[in-house]
């Protein structure tokens, strides 16, 4: 398979994953997720197994209303069965009944297991001042 074909496939998988989250399609999200999957973000680091992921998705405290993966995504193949994708994303969510829009830089590591790609690692860094000066602390 040509490199550009695999790159397109990885970007397609990433979009499908986001769409599964938006649609609250737990089965598709689980099919696309390694067991366990390492996740990092503003809340810290976690290793999430399928049972935990399913529970999280079914009882989410937020709703993903829309998402846009911005142009400029980068895909790097580390071998026949490992690929990394990094991109910027805009997310529109409803959190505790209120609309929230955020921009973030995300990355995922995809591995091919038994002939199918699964996400083994996902990271998200919310865009903004790298020193956090644009964030408001609540007492």
Please give the residue ranges for each predicted region.
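A beta-strand edge to alpha-helix "cap/lid" segment located at domain peripheries
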Residues: 2-31, 38-139
């Amino acid at each position: 398979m040509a490199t550009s074909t695999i790159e397109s496939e990885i970007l397609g998988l990433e979009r499908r994953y986001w769409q599964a989250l938006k649609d609250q399609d737990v089965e598709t999200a689980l099919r696309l997720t390694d067991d366990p999957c390492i996740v990092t973000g503003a809340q810290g680091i976690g290793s999430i197994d399928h049972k935990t992921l399913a529970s999280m998705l079914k009882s989410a405290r937020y709703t993903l209303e829309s998402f846009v993966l911005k142009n400029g995504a980068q895909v790097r193949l580390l071998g026949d069965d490992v690929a990394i994708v990094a991109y910027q994303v805009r997310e529109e969510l409803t959190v505790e009944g209120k609309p929230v829009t955020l921009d973030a830089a995300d990355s995922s590591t995809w591995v091919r297991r038994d002939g199918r790609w699964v996400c083994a690692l996902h990271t998200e860094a919310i865009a903004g001042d790298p020193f956090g000066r644009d964030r408001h602390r609540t007492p």
